[in-house]
């Protein structure tokens, strides 16, 4: 493995495990470095299968709380890009509606946890480094909309980071 200021290169390998520990000093200006080093050290002490298993269990503890079955459709077997194109012509795809519902839950689950910051205006789904409005927190409808699904999709605790942010 070779690392430079702008790249990481892996050659002649069948696999590579790259561990990254990222965070913010939004709440703790002095302790973020130790916090990140602790999490990286914990991750380094585990093999990939353990890390994956622990991540999957944590994710599924939230995601598996809800299932939504709106019925089977003729397009259930299609790749998503074909389904979306077909949906533009004919809205009769109950499975796509259920998939979209679960995608919204996935975005919220993936963007926050108790004790962390809530998703910002762009969340983690922005496709650029320089986000519109700098990905700021504005306590208006835009930030609130990120949290609308929390209660109705059985992810109540995921709106708590927003409450904590507004308290501070």
Residue ranges and their predicted role:
Residues 141-151:
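Well-ordered alpha-helical segments within folded domains of soluble proteins
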Residues 1-137, 155-168:
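Acidic/polar, glycine-enriched structural segments that form the non-catalytic walls/loops
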């Amino acid at each position: 493995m070779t690392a430079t200021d702008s790249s990481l290169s892996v050659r002649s390998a069948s696999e590579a495990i790259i561990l990254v520990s990222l965070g913010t000093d939004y709440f703790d200006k002095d302790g973020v470095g130790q916090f990140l080093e602790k999490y990286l050290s914990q991750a380094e002490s585990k093999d990939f299968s353990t890390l994956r298993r622990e991540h999957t269990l944590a994710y599924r503890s939230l995601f598996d709380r809800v299932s939504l079955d709106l019925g089977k459709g003729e397009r259930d077997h299609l790749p998503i890009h074909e389904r979306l194109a077909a949906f533009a012509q004919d809205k009769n795809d109950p499975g796509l509606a259920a998939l979209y519902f679960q995608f919204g839950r996935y975005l919220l689950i993936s963007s926050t946890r108790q004790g962390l910051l809530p998703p910002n205006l762009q969340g983690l789904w922005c496709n650029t480094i320089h986000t519109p409005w700098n990905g700021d927190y504005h306590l208006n409808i835009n930030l609130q909309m990120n949290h609308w699904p929390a209660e109705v999709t059985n992810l109540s605790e995921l709106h708590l980071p927003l409450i904590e942010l507004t308290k501070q």
